UniProtKB/Swiss-Prot annotation:
It is an enzyme of class 5 (isomerase). GO terms for biological process: anaerobic glutamate catabolic process; glutamate catabolic process via L-citramalate. It comes from Yersinia enterocolitica serotype O:8 / biotype 1B (strain NCTC 13174 / 8081). PROSITE patterns: B12_BINDING. Pathway: Amino-acid degradation; L-glutamate degradation via mesaconate pathway; acetate and pyruvate from L-glutamate: step 1/4. Adenosylcob(III)alamin binds at A13, D14, C15, H16, A17, S61, S62, I63, N93, L94, V95, I96, G97. Its cofactor is adenosylcob(III)alamin. Residues 3-140 form the B12-binding domain. Catalyzes the carbon skeleton rearrangement of L-glutamate to L-threo-3-methylaspartate ((2S,3S)-3-methylaspartate). Gene3D superfamilies: Cobalamin-binding domain. This is Glutamate mutase sigma subunit. NCBIfam families: MthylAspMutase (TIGR01501), PRK02261.1 (NF002612). It catalyses: (2S,3S)-3-methyl-L-aspartate = L-glutamate. Keywords: Cobalamin, Cobalt, Isomerase, Metal-binding.
Length: 148
């Protein structure tokens, strides 16, 4: 399998760059082709980059706690732009205040994200899960019609 292309960045008005650099390095070390949009990224910028590069996934991160607001409508915007089936991942400190992570995960999955990662999730696990998801999608796209 060719190295999967992923678009990463920090959404909204969030300017926390260090975690983004760590993600870029880890994903690159795990043979992802990383398109890193940096910080303060809009939904349209993620989607534009995914379309331009043929990315298999978009990885949204947020540290400042407003990811819940910044991510509203992301899946719908992907559908509207013709990439409705793209894998969407989100992680970090996604909401303000202390909440049970299962509530946060349910909320973001309800927004159309395929996986939601807590701030303390092991990045090795993240890479493994993303690769498995991407391989599964690519295999289903390659299967003859009726064999999926």
């Amino acid at each position: 399998m060719q190295n999967p292309t992923i678009v990463i960045g920090v959404i909204g008005a969030d300017c926390h760059a260090v975690g983004n650099k760590v993600l870029d390095r880890v994903f690159t070390m795990h043979n992802f082709s990383v398109i890193n949009l940096g910080v303060m990224v809009s939904q349209d910028e993620y989607i534009d980059a995914a379309i331009e590069t043929g990315a298999q996934a978009i990885v949204v991160s947020s540290i400042y706690g407003h990811g819940e607001v910044d991510c509203i409508g992301m899946r719908e915007n992907c559908v509207e732009r013709g990439i409705g089936e793209i894998l969407l991942y989100v992680g970090g400190n996604l909401v303000i205040g202390k909440h049970d992570f299962s509530e946060i995960e349910t909320k973001f999955k309800g927004m159309g994200f395929n996986r939601v990662f807590a701030p303390d999730t092991d990045l090795e696990l993240v890479c493994s899960l993303m690769k498995r998801d991407i391989e599964r999608v690519m295999q289903s796209e390659e299967a003859p019609e009726g064999m999926q």
